Amino acid sequence: MQEGKISQIIGPVVDVDFPEGQLPSILDALTVTRQDGSKLVLETQQHLGEERVRTIAMEGTDGLVRGMSAVNTGKPIQVPVGGEVLGRMLNVVGDPIDGKGPVPAKKTYSIHRAAPKFDELSTKTEMFETGIKVIDLLEPYSRGGKTGLFGGAGVGKTVLIMELINNIAKQQSGYSVFAGVGERTREGNDLWHEMMESGVIDKTALVFGQMNEPPGARARVALTGLSIAEYFREEEGRDVLLFIDNIFRFTQAGSEVSALLGRMPSAVGYQPTLSTEMGELQDRITSTKKGSVTSVQAIYVPADDLTDPAPATAFTHLDATTVLSRQIAELGIYPAVDPLDSTSRILDPNIVGDDHYNTAQAVKQILQRYKDLQDIIAILGMDELSDEDKLVVARARKVQRFLSQPFFVAEAFTGLAGKYVKLEDTIKGFKEIIDGRHDNLPEAAFYLVGTIEEAVAKAKTL
């Protein structure tokens, strides 16, 4: 074990001197034992010459002094993987933070791993059914694909993520990995308790590096979650869901340490290695012939500017986008997905079939027409519309309400049992509304129901 001495500490960046010929490799983990016996992990970032390396700390550097010993572990940060991490909450270096004692994992993985080779990748494009009508119909997720979840505060990003975890765990007995990157600790705490209550915790591993952590932890915790997910894909051949909340903070953490590492900033002060870092992370999220990692990434958009380098770099990797809208949340329609703003690469008749594609396009057309007519309605009222337009508005309002759905994880708020709607039922329901087969039903019948049969049954009780 090579041992070095700390020579300089600048916030989260620590320089360590090693004896000649014993330099650690780039990305190797070093451990420092503090006075109280706790261990601090440093990750090697640069060789500065003269037997000195520059490292980033994964925890606060309080209490470190020059001359302290740093031991080279000889390999990158290793985290526990396998069935033992399910139902547990870990930090960036794989230590448990749930107070339930050590994780008895038989195997560890490095957080830095090569992306799968070309010949290992699966080329078939498959739709991934979520049981959420608006997603399955208008912006279908692909298995092994990447989805961006764009939304401001309080429009339901976390509830949507919770519902996805719940549906995957119950319907497809799949595993989920949740990586909390630089978000509020309170939200992580809420998520943990909600998962315990809803019973999905046994099929989920949680990894957190929240806002209060130093940038080293926030820049690496997404990789920790990804390694745990990769184990289930490679060694157990599973289809895993990886949730990252929030991918913007991963970039933000990288930009915080970039200047301290002495790199010249690039556009808007971001790190010059922005697209490389994002690419290394995103390239590992993929389907192989063994299994798949499907990711849903919450993306914060600074100052609502989608051309900002951070969200713009993430955009290039996405297969589908789900945009949550405050205007729709204000109407009381949950999930508050904007049906006209959300997109998917696989909404293509060759992949999802003509029936699905045509129904989705018809839904978008009728909603767009309603949107165009809203100004006229606001100024002149409904009476000034032609009979044809009145019919369009009536059907569009039914479609809009039918896009809402009671969630399993929101039963406490809605008082309604959650619904998982199969794709064929979703397509059938919207097709019937658009064809005018339910023009005689009141629009309230379509609000917060699952299938079209439930809407018809609800209409009889109104």
UniProtKB/Swiss-Prot annotation:
Q: Which Pfam families match?
A: ATP-synt_ab, ATP-synt_ab_N, ATP-synt_VA_C
Q: What is its EC number?
A: 7.1.2.2
Residues that hold ATP according to the record: 151-158
InterPro entries in alphabetical order: AAA+_ATPase, ATP-synt_VA_C, ATP_synth_F1_bsu, ATPase_a/bsu_AS, ATPase_alpha/beta_chains, ATPase_F1/V1/A1_a/bsu_N, ATPase_F1/V1/A1_a/bsu_N_sf, ATPase_F1/V1/A1_a/bsu_nucl-bd
Its UniProt entry gives the catalysed reaction(s) as: ATP + H2O + 4 H(+)(in) = ADP + phosphate + 5 H(+)(out)
Please give the GO cellular component terms listed in this UniProt entry: plasma membrane; proton-transporting ATP synthase complex
Location in or out of the cell: Cell inner membrane
Q: What does this protein do?
A: Produces ATP from ADP in the presence of a proton gradient across the membrane. The catalytic sites are hosted primarily by the beta subunits.
Give the family per the record: Belongs to the ATPase alpha/beta chains family.
- Name used for this protein in its record: ATP synthase subunit beta 2
Q: What is the organism of origin for this protein?
A: Chlorobaculum tepidum (strain ATCC 49652 / DSM 12025 / NBRC 103806 / TLS)
